[in-house]
Amino acid sequence: MENRLEERYSKEIAPALVSKFNYKSTMQAPKIEKIVLNMGVGDATQNAKLLDEAVDELTLISGQHPLITKAKKSIAGFRLREGMPIGAKVTLRGERMYDFLDKLINVSLPRVRDFHGISPKSFDGRGNYTLGVKEQLIFPEIDYDKVNRVRGLDVVIVTTANTDEEALELLTQVGMPFAK
């Protein structure tokens, strides 16, 4: 069964992008390739239990088991050794990606306190969008009573768009609530 967002992309969004940017075919229209969720747990160097909690929360949010990220090099100032676990990340593609994006747009982002839309300036110049979430409590899967520490996470939406303008149009059509 095709996700409603995926269906809307193929029936409405892709043709609209083709006409706006004058592509020759719908295959040229930018599409969302993957979504990467990253949660850095800097305190995991002192307390390994914090990393386990972050992994559990990311599993609940994304629906798949995260990869534990390790430090690339030692930094004495942070009491960090090379190879120490310092975070977790998940790469979502296909149906899970569309499910997550749908949930992010329609459920999670409206739950952010004092929400006035997301910044349209967070594109990287290559058509990818990065969104910082300050607290994991905005996701409906996270139980407020079971959380002992508020953690943020990064949401990176990787698109096949060549320019930020194309990516902005794609994400606006998908329904991302950009601030005016």
UniProtKB/Swiss-Prot annotation:
SUPFAM superfamilies: RL5-like. Transmembrane segments: none annotated. PROSITE patterns: RIBOSOMAL_L5. GO terms for cellular component: ribonucleoprotein complex; ribosome. This is Large ribosomal subunit protein uL5. GO terms for molecular function: rRNA binding; structural constituent of ribosome; tRNA binding. Keywords: Ribonucleoprotein, Ribosomal protein, RNA-binding, rRNA-binding, tRNA-binding. Belongs to the universal ribosomal protein uL5 family. The gene is rplE. One of its GO terms (biological process) is translation. NCBIfam families: PRK00010.1. Part of the 50S ribosomal subunit; part of the 5S rRNA/L5/L18/L25 subcomplex. Contacts the 5S rRNA and the P site tRNA. Forms a bridge to the 30S subunit in the 70S ribosome. It comes from Lacticaseibacillus paracasei (strain ATCC 334 / BCRC 17002 / CCUG 31169 / CIP 107868 / KCTC 3260 / NRRL B-441). InterPro entries: Ribosomal_uL5 (IPR002132), Ribosomal_uL5_bac-type (IPR020930), Ribosomal_uL5_C (IPR031309), Ribosomal_uL5_CS (IPR020929), Ribosomal_uL5_dom_sf (IPR022803), Ribosomal_uL5_N (IPR031310). Gene3D superfamilies: 3.30.1440.10.
